[in-house]
From Swiss-Prot:
Belongs to the polyketide transferase af380 family. GO terms for molecular function: hydrolase activity; transferase activity. The keyword Transferase applies. InterPro entries: AB_hydrolase_fold (IPR029058), Polyketide_trans_af380 (IPR051411), Xaa-Pro-like_dom (IPR000383). Reducing polyketide synthase; part of the gene cluster that mediates the biosynthesis of fusamarins, isocoumarin derivatives that show moderate cytotoxicity with IC(50) values between 1 and 50 uM. The polyketide synthase FMN1 probably synthesizes two different polyketides, a tetra- and a pentaketide, containinga varying number of double bonds depending on the selective actions of the trans-enoyl reductase FMN2. The polyketide transferase FMN3 is then responsible for the fusion of the two carbon chains to produce the furanone skeleton of fusamarins. It comes from Fusarium mangiferae. Induction: Expression is induced when NaNO(3) is used as sole nitrogen source. Expression is positively regulated by the cluster-specific transcription factor FMN4. This is Polyketide transferase FMN3. Keywords: Transferase. Disruption phenotype: Impairs the production of fusamarins. The active site is at residues 110, 235, 264.
Length: 289
């Protein structure tokens, strides 16, 4: 089936770029997003196409400062602004001729699982949410916080004096990251193998923003929107125990799907259909289609 290049505006005037996967008939829509520092090419095109093939019009897009979307500095994430980008994506998708605006869902992986839960808590137009391996705690290892905050304040002063933003690596060659748990030594080989064009840099202000974000304060407000959490049992990058604690704090209606023996990303390789069928079952019940 076809994929269309699309653009849409944000409330503050940026143009965001994405791909639309139109279903064969009028019905539900879903916005699918791949996670922190990832372009739209990462992981989710196959997910979007799967939903398209099962009667759901799917949208994936580059959030601000990433890929082909507007925004400066490049590779900078403000959690609050990223959530607002999801609101504006809902506005765009709700006006499409194939989409029933009363049947729009969000789907987020890792960091964007967090963002989609937040967007759902704040946007009554969202009628279901699927959070896959969502990162819950953005505060990182305590022993690293002060050094990063000191660098962030140096960066603010330098930018005020006309200097370029300071960047940190997204993931080091050995798989370690600035804030916390390692992504594993196979991270970059996997990105190369999958031909995902990831820029290995993130502004230090991104981490400053992350330190002030706490999804647990919003989790209770996801309800009454139906929510599904998909948790890989052996997730180390986004610890399964933290995901379960967030799920337990949610109100009803909610659905939990544990992926036995799976890690943060390896669930996407192998029997993906069985994972997706559970999500489709949830969405059919939540969106009534």
């Amino acid at each position: 089936m076809s994929r269309l290049d699309v653009t849409f505006k944000t409330l503050d005037g940026l143009t965001l770029s994405g791909w639309l996967y139109p279903a064969a008939q009028y019905g539900p829509g879903i916005i699918v997003s791949p996670g922190f520092n990832m372009p739209r090419e990462a992981f989710v095109p196959d997910i979007a196409q799967w939903y398209q093939n099962h009667g759901i019009t799917a949208l994936i897009f580059d959030t601000r400062t990433y890929g082909l979307s507007d925004g400066q500095p490049r590779q900078e994430t403000s959690a609050r602004k990223r959530v607002e980008d999801f609101h504006d994506a809902v506005t765009f998708l709700s006006k499409h001729e194939l989409v029933d605006p009363e049947k729009i869902a969000l789907w987020g992986l890792c960091f964007d699982g967090n963002m989609c839960l937040a967007a759902t808590a704040l946007d009554p137009r969202v009628h279901a949410v699927v959070a896959v391996a969502p990162v819950i705690d953005l505060h990182g290892f305590p022993e690293r916080r002060r050094a990063i905050l000191e660098l962030a304040m140096q960066d603010r002063e330098a930018q005020m004096a006309g200097e370029e933003p300071i960047y940190l690596p997204y993931v080091n060659e050995d798989g370690t990251v600035p804030l916390g748990p390692s992504m594993g030594s196979d991270f970059w080989p996997m990105m190369t193998r999958l031909k995902i064009p990831v820029e290995n840099r993130v502004t230090v202000q991104t981490f400053y923003s992350a330190f002030s974000w706490d999804i647990m304060t919003l989790i209770p407000y996801v309800s009454p929107t139906p929510a599904m959490m998909v948790t890989p049992e052996n997730d180390i990058e986004c610890p399964a125990a933290e995901q379960i604690a967030a799920f337990e704090k949610m109100g009803e209606p909610k659905t939990f799907h544990l992926l036995p023996g799976k890690g943060h990303l390896d669930w996407a390789f192998g029997d993906v259909d069985s994972v997706m069928e559970k999500q489709l079952e949830f969405l059919k019940g939540a969106l009534n289609f």
